[in-house]
Amino acid sequence: MASRKESAASGSNPLDFPVKQIQVDGLVVLKIIKHYQEEGQGSEVVQGVLLGLVVEDRLEITNCFPFPQHTEDDVEFDEVQYQMEMMRSLRHVNIDHLHVGWYQSTYYGSFVSRALLDSQFSYQHAIEESVVLIYDPLKTAQGSLCLKAYRLTPKLMEICKEKDFTPEGLKKAAVAYEHMFEEVPIFIKNSHLINVLMWDLQEKSTLADKHELLNLSSSNHLEKSLQLLMDRVDDMSQDIVKYNTYCRNLSKQQQQKQQYQQRRQQENAQRQSRGEPPLPEEDISKMFKAPQAPPRMDTLLIAGQINNYCQNIKEFTSQNLGKLFMAEALQSNSS
């Protein structure tokens, strides 16, 4: 396990997240990209295990291996056994084999889901330094590597441990979609020989046309992002309708309960004035059962995904607007 023994001995809170930055070897980045290029198709997600170690306040990810693609009908495949065999093989060849998280590809930034939440909670509950690396192949194909690291916040970890996803539980814990995931800064490290090779390749590469930098990105990206955003907004509206229905039913039941109690009080007062014994006590909670509150965790995840789509659209449009202004300035200077 990659957790520090010192923190456990000192009695520090495991939810303080001592890791402040993540160092990723270039080999890991290339393996993740290669995994998606070989097995990822369109919206299909690829996943794998991250290996490394913790050094002071830095998490060093030094290696990784992919999860093999398998169908639900493949009952003979044991994912846990596969991970143990892979880690045992890496240990035999003297490679870092400590489990420090996992990685996953994303399709147009669609990674905020219940499956990711449950998986990251399992990893982080077992090893507090665990993170998930999200690789976006579409943004990477546009010319800049998009690789981000996330982990669950302490508030969300407590909520997931208690499994209290009711509106009252989330309100008491003050958990909103902004407080679900936190991004950890990462930097990529290469050996000195690789850095020299990259510098040499850069010197030998031919100079590309500078005007290519002003080419606008494909409109399909914006169209698909807006379509996914509208789908999530529709899901959010449906959840809002369900929650409003629950609130109306709860208010109606509370009103009926108060009216019933008032009638009993009036009737008991009349019976007491006539010298008669009061009515027997009844279990009001059995007579007026509260409606089942809809779980709000899915709504928070939808809100987080909507926010993610909005950020992606904002970045996409701001880059294109900047290119338009630069192209206009170049055209006016040349004329």
From Swiss-Prot:
Gene3D superfamilies: Cytidine Deaminase, domain 2. InterPro entries: eIF3h, eIF3h_C, JAMM/MPN+_dom, JAMM_MPN+_peptidase_M67A, MPN. The keyword Protein biosynthesis applies. Signal peptide: none annotated. Keywords: Cytoplasm, Initiation factor, Protein biosynthesis. Its main location: cytoplasm. One of its GO terms (biological process) is lateral line development. SMART domains: JAB_MPN. Residues 22-156 form the MPN domain. One of its GO terms (cellular component) is eukaryotic 48S preinitiation complex. GO terms for molecular function: metallopeptidase activity; translation initiation factor activity. It is found in: Cytoplasm. Residues 254-282 are annotated as: Disordered. It comes from the Eukaryota. Residues 254-272 have a biased composition (Low complexity). Component of the eukaryotic translation initiation factor 3 (eIF-3) complex, which is involved in protein synthesis of a specialized repertoire of mRNAs and, together with other initiation factors, stimulates binding of mRNA and methionyl-tRNAi to the 40S ribosome. The eIF-3 complex specifically targets and initiates translation of a subset of mRNAs involved in cell proliferation. Component of the eukaryotic translation initiation factor 3 (eIF-3) complex, which is composed of 13 subunits: eif3a, eif3b, eif3c, eif3d, eif3e, eif3f, eif3g, eif3h, eif3i, eif3j, eif3k, eif3l and eif3m. Belongs to the eIF-3 subunit H family. This is Eukaryotic translation initiation factor 3 subunit H-A. It comes from Danio rerio (Zebrafish).
